[in-house]
Amino acid sequence: MTDYIADYRTWLQEEKHASDNTLSSYLRDINQFKTWLLGAGSPDLRRVKKDTINEYMLYLSGAGKSPATITRCTASLKSFYAYMLGRGAVKTNPAKNIAALKVERKCPEILTSKEVELFLEQPKCVDEKGYRDHAMLELLYATGIRVSELIGLDMGDVNLAGGFIRCRSKTRERIIPLYRTAIKALRDYITDIRPRIISGPDEQALFVNMNGGRMSRQGFWKIIKYYQEKAEIDKDITPHTLRHSFAVHLLENGADIRSIQEMLGHADISSTQIYTHVIKKQLKDVYNKAHPRA
């Protein structure tokens, strides 16, 4: 029998140029759906009807999955069956008219400017790890890039003389400026520290672990959690927290939302507009606390 999921993976990679995160999420959703079908006694992906998918959505809801997870799963199935339809493996897309659940967009956790300053002060430039970690955290807050983009940076993506980095994806590229402190932190790391810890002269990764290979997501996550504990900041800090804080602090200081959208790499302005809601909420909180008649 044709392995439709393997073929779909190739299609996502080669035709749709899907990001690694999209690829991982979609394939995980499709494989979980296939497992559920097998348990329901109907393992053939070609014989799925709209009612089958509705039943699966009810199963996910009953299993305690969040609306966001169920909505993403719906999108995964729509994409998979659009591919199947294009191949002639099915006559209709059974997921096409499945309504997505309304997902409440929560305001992201934001650090204050003082909390950011405290957090960035935690790595001490007294050894190789301290210099590297200091450079990573400064760069993350200076640019607002995603953690996947941070660990994916190569040496050729950094222009210290010009004061910017080049952030690439499979379909686009963006240029993001750096402030002076971040430039200095990067220069110190690149000039004095990185040559000592890379695995060999052919290593292209900007940030490497202490074994000399490219930094992993898990490794960077542990670094974030380590410095959160040291800073004693009573907030759940993740790699994305600095990205959110970067956007809100720029807005607070007068940056226009289109420029922030470009720096964050958001395809849709609505993804960036959530940060304006954060600021409005902060203003309302200040008003309610400070106004004598509030």
Where are these regions (language model features)?
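Conserved catalytic core of the tyrosine transesterase superfamily
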Residues: M1-A294
